[in-house]
Amino acid sequence: MKVLGRYKNGNYDVTLLSDGTKIRETEDDEFIPDFAESMDIKLTNHCSLGCPYCHEGSTPEGEHGDILNEKFIDTLHPYQEVAFGGGDVTSHPDLIPFLRRLKERHIIANITVNQYQLYNEKELIQRLVDEQLIYGLGVSLMVLTDEFIETVSQFPNAVIHVINGIVLPEEIEEMAGHNLKLLILGYKELRRGNSFLREHLEQVEKNKAWMKEHLWEYVSKFAVVSFDNLAIEQLDVKNYLSEEEWNEFFMGDDSEFTYYIDMVNRQFAKSSTAPFDERYPLMDSCDDMFEKIRKRKHE
């Protein structure tokens, strides 16, 4: 397995491998970072798909972030990870020069696209992979088909994103056994996600209940199954793991090692689901933003 990079952060060392594995090592009892290991960054609010549960509220009229001119980009540390989403990141006119700039500074970039964006922009995405402008590729599932499984399988570092409450039991069952990587996201009750939940509450709760009861029957049938922190809470993941397993696999609470940046509205917060009154104006330093988020957490 290829080592992408190693760096020291506070009282511990981090090793990043080409398959997405992250290894933290310390001689102390806890990991105390000096800077964020990773950031979830929104590049654009433009998207033509109109998903009814989109917590970002993206639209065809949505604006792009001014991604080439934000000062904090020049304060990123080598081998920090940045996960770019939207909106439709492939629609941003400055995406390639932006990613090239990050590559020159040894920043590990990942993007998330929708299933249909993967189909429509496959050549662009393949180019980003071939030029090592991105390493991780998240693909949000819309409708499970054989074509989807076949297309995703062509990208070794692709991870299928599904939403707890939206993904159907039969989709989990059909994806199992294909050596796929799966990320389960918690259902976000924000923007269009709120209105969708009101209209489809019974079905969403039914899907959530199935996931909580049956998911663990299928975990071994995927190459990897991971969760965001909201899904960990909604699915009570900790209850299904031993203390040793939890300590090995849990990567930390929101704002402990990560935070969220919205380059469209020029704001940052502990996560993309943070209340609107807990989002702050963008600063010129990524470390200053992380420090502010951490201070708020401990207040």
List each language-model region with its residue ranges.
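N-terminal [4Fe-4S]-dependent radical SAM core
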Residues: 1-41, 246, 256
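Residue-level recognition of short loop/turn positions
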Residues: 50, 86, 264-265
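Alpha-helical scaffolding segments of alpha/beta enzyme cores, especially the outer helices
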Residues: 71, 94-104, 123, 127, ...
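A short, Lys/Arg-enriched amphipathic alpha-helix followed by its capping loop at the start of a domain
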Residues: 71-78
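Cysteine/selenocysteine-centered motifs that mediate thiol-based redox chemistry or coordinate metal-sulfur cofactors
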Residues: 290-299
